[in-house]
């Protein structure tokens, strides 16, 4: 059994993760970290499963009080990096679903993981379908280099563009030379109308109630277009990827950024 703690158990993703871990035959929920409800049990929190795992309001105290193999962090970009550093310092393997990590952050965290000889995973998106979308988009960009990305999320999402959109753009840029798209003399009547620029690609962010997580990668060529789209209808769609990450992180000794690097 892999012993797992969850940071951020009352968020929408956190609730699904706690439920999945509690029900999984190969995983054991041993604790959760929440800024409120210190000293309570998971089963005493609204909407969470009937688990006797304790609630801690501080990650460090949680890690020193329990035997934990993996920390699943589903908090915020501000907390994700700090929680990852604390977990690595305690020899606990972090699986982090928040975004906002810079290249320098990833380099430093990878160095720390390798010094400790343990695995770590940062996943901008846990939906396996979204990972396949990114892989398909990278392949398409070899032949259709004119591309724009449109990502759509619920209106409570704090960062824009999404980590998935940025990761998609990065993967495309590995096979596509930077090029300016659109008319060379085009103007914006409203600032930002053409989206954010990434090596000539435009990334557009939509935030509306009723959405969960959606992305289109739109390619254009002579006399044709190609659209690659993924939709997460609910947060259960992310749980197979969370479980895969927990199982995978136990067998690696470096930091992996992006589920596409652990899916064959």
UniProtKB/Swiss-Prot annotation:
Keyword terms: Amino-acid biosynthesis, Cytoplasm, Diaminopimelate biosynthesis, Lysine biosynthesis, NAD, NADP, Oxidoreductase
One GO BP annotation of this record: diaminopimelate biosynthetic process
Binding of (S)-2,3,4,5-tetrahydrodipicolinate, residues: 154, 163-164
Compartment annotation: Cytoplasm
Residues binding NADP(+): 36
Pathway per the UniProt entry: Amino-acid biosynthesis; L-lysine biosynthesis via DAP pathway; (S)-tetrahydrodipicolinate from L-aspartate: step 4/4
Coiled coil: none
GO MF annotations in UniProt: 4-hydroxy-tetrahydrodipicolinate reductase; NAD binding; NADP binding; oxidoreductase activity, acting on CH or CH2 groups, NAD or NADP as acceptor
Enzyme active site: 153 (proton donor/acceptor), 157 (proton donor)
Cross-referenced PROSITE patterns: DAPB
Swiss-Prot/TrEMBL catalytic activity: (S)-2,3,4,5-tetrahydrodipicolinate + NAD(+) + H2O = (2S,4S)-4-hydroxy-2,3,4,5-tetrahydrodipicolinate + NADH + H(+); (S)-2,3,4,5-tetrahydrodipicolinate + NADP(+) + H2O = (2S,4S)-4-hydroxy-2,3,4,5-tetrahydrodipicolinate + NADPH + H(+)
Keyword NAD among UniProt keywords: yes
GO cellular component: cytosol
InterPro entries recorded: DapB_C, DapB_N, DapB_N_CS, DHDPR_bac, NAD(P)-bd_dom_sf
Record bears the keyword Metal-binding: no
Superkingdom to which the source organism belongs: Bacteria
Annotated binding of NAD(+), by residue: 8-13, 97-99, 123-126
EC number: 1.17.1.8
Protein family (similarity comment): Belongs to the DapB family.
Described purpose of this protein according to its UniProt entry: Catalyzes the conversion of 4-hydroxy-tetrahydrodipicolinate (HTPA) to tetrahydrodipicolinate.
Protein name, UniProt field: 4-hydroxy-tetrahydrodipicolinate reductase
Organism encoding this protein: Halalkalibacterium halodurans (strain ATCC BAA-125 / DSM 18197 / FERM 7344 / JCM 9153 / C-125)
Gene: dapB
């Amino acid at each position: 059994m892999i012993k797992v703690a969850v940071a951020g158990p009352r968020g929408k993703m956190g609730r699904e993760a706690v439920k999945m871990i509690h029900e999984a035959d190969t995983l054991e929920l041993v604790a959760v970290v929440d800024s409120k409800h210190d000293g309570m049990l998971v089963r005493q929190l609204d909407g969470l499963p009937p688990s006797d795992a304790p609630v801690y309001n501080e990650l460090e105290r949680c890690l020193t009080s329990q035997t934990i193999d993996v920390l699943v962090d589903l908090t915020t970009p501000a907390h994700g990096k700090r929680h990852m550093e604390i977990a690595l310092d305690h020899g606990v393997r972090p699986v982090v679903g928040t975004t906002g990590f810079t290249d320098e952050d990833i380099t430093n965290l990878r160095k720390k993981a390798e010094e400790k000889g343990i695995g770590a995973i940062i996943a901008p998106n846990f939906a396996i379908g979204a990972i396949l979308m990114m892989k398909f988009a990278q392949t398409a960009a070899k032949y259709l280099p004119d591309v724009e990305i449109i990502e759509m999320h619920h209106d409570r999402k704090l960062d824009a563009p999404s980590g998935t959109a940025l990761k998609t753009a990065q993967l495309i840029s590995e096979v596509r030379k930077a090029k300016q798209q659109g008319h060379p003399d085009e103007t914006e009547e409203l600032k930002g109308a053409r989206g954010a620029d990434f090596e000539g690609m435009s990334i557009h962010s939509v935030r509306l109630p009723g959405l969960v997580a959606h992305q289109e990668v739109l390619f254009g060529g002579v006399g044709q277009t190609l659209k690659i789209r993924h939709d997460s209808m609910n947060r259960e769609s992310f749980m197979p990827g969370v479980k895969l990450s927990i199982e995978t992180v136990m067998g690696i000794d470096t930091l992996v950024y992006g589920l596409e690097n652990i899916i064959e």
